[in-house]
Amino acid sequence: SGPGCDRPDRIFLGLIEEIIARLADLLEASGAVLDDTLRQVFSPQSRKRPAALQAALERIGTESDLIARVRLSLLSLERVLTFYSATQQSRAADSGKLKAILKGHQRDLQALQEHTDSMSSRVSLAVDATIGMIGLQQNDTVRVLSVVAALFLPPTLIASTYGMNFQRMPELQWAY
């Protein structure tokens, strides 16, 4: 279904088609990883395991880097196709068919660029959600520490009232 391989132009467009397909596959796989990671972030088990949220944040970072690299590749391919389109020889007998294939590739690139923008937004959501869950865990920890601090408040208050002034402590004159 590709352009064929009987001439250099057709081989070039066939290679471009394959590169675009592989970039689309990378984006699809990255989207699946992001979906899985978000499911794990929002699962009840992740709130009990801080290491799971840290691992999720690392996976999100890795996918973000991959998406950025795919975006850069798409921009480079767009420049290549723009240059090729501007310099294409129209003397070939089937230049109309090649132009149609070229336009199709350019539309595919445009669609994938929009998809990478969407994926970048999803990465942003995933990072925000993960950091929010980490913040909730920290709130739970601070709540426990606040209760413990409140338990030690009365002895601390007594110690701060009397301080180290042993002559003013009435308990020293108590009989045993």
Model-identified regions with their sequence ranges:
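Extended amphipathic alpha-helical scaffolding segments in membrane-proximal extra-membrane regions
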Residues: 1-132
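Hydrophobic alpha-helical transmembrane segments and their immediately adjacent juxtamembrane loops
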Residues: 107-176
